[in-house]
Curated annotation (Swiss-Prot):
Organism: Chaerilus tryznai
GO process annotations (BP): regulation of defense response to virus
Additional notes on this entry: Shows a low ability to inhibit hepatitis C virus (HCV) infection in Huh7.5.1 cells.
Main location class: secreted
Signal sequence interval, chain numbering: 1-23
Keyword Signal included in the entry's annotation: yes
Name used for this protein in its record: Peptide Ctry2606
Subcellular location: Secreted
Amino acid sequence: MKTQTALFSFFLVLLLVATQTEGGILDAITGLLGKRALRNQNFVDYAFDPSLSAADWRALETLLEEY
């Protein structure tokens, strides 16, 4: 019984260490990629152009109808 308890405790600690390490690595990678991805969020500003007239929108709609 003592051996089973010792093995269970050992593997539980090993699992906790592996989970914390994986979380730290994934957090670091996500942080690096996330920061890089967040820098280029201003591309959405170009999606809406207020200078387009209603005729321009109709022309775009007819061009993209069959796409």
